[in-house]
């Protein structure tokens, strides 16, 4: 079933849903650059105003995956992505990137999908570059990195080249659109398990159900009630969990895991170098809030990766990975491996 762009726009004005096949068609037009900038802007703004449905988001993610440069990973067991939507305005250091090293050190395979900072002071790509990682890898090189080190970073512009067809429109609009929530749904390596942070509480239930439709295995979508797109130490965290095809929504608290509730204010950074310093301090087992929040998030990721039977068990594994020095060693391992591909 096809729909004209004008019909789709009218549908959004009337707050009516664009059906799955129609959304597939529309999204392909956008990704190919077949819509005028005016029409593309009108449609994605209309979707935002009426509020995108689970079906519309799932269809859009399906098309983004179609257009991606895929990373072929041979062994899908214990394979996880740790990612946030960003846009939470918290300006903290790169917690999910730090968690990647801990999660890999504890035995999971991590395919991290990220970009440079837009609303944040330091995106995952920025801090990895500050650490000395070569982020400009081709798909086969990322696959080799995952196989060799247990970690691979997929720099979004290298894996979603069709996004250039909507980039100028998004930049000029300057407001959140459906594309702000598609990134975490479109991992080019197809990681079946995921820890996903979101910038709004309503997205917890939406994103986990989108992942359910997309056939994911074990996913935890989280929103810290202090506004963080991470599992928070400063407040309760809302969780939407997909496991065995079923969705459960609940809250967790730092105290549930023997952790103290503390403010996240000390985690703020101004740039990638400050983020690098805080990340390395946490991985060097320096006591403090940074180490504890990395332990909490890595523990949750280890549960998502099915390495741990619970978040509590995952936290214990994360503590051991940091205390043993294995997590810190993973940084040097990734730097060494990726630098061989420097162009």
Curated annotation (Swiss-Prot):
Cofactor note (record): Binds 2 magnesium ions per monomer.
Function: Catalyzes the transfer of the phosphoribosyl group of 5-phosphorylribose-1-pyrophosphate (PRPP) to anthranilate to yield N-(5'-phosphoribosyl)-anthranilate (PRA).
Protein name according to UniProt: Anthranilate phosphoribosyltransferase
Gene: trpD
Cofactor(s) the protein needs: Mg(2+)
Organism domain of life: Bacteria
EC id: 2.4.2.18
Positions annotated to bind 5-phospho-alpha-D-ribose 1-diphosphate: 84, 87-88, 92, 94-97, 112-120, 124
Reactions this protein catalyses: N-(5-phospho-beta-D-ribosyl)anthranilate + diphosphate = 5-phospho-alpha-D-ribose 1-diphosphate + anthranilate
Ligand binding (anthranilate 2): 170
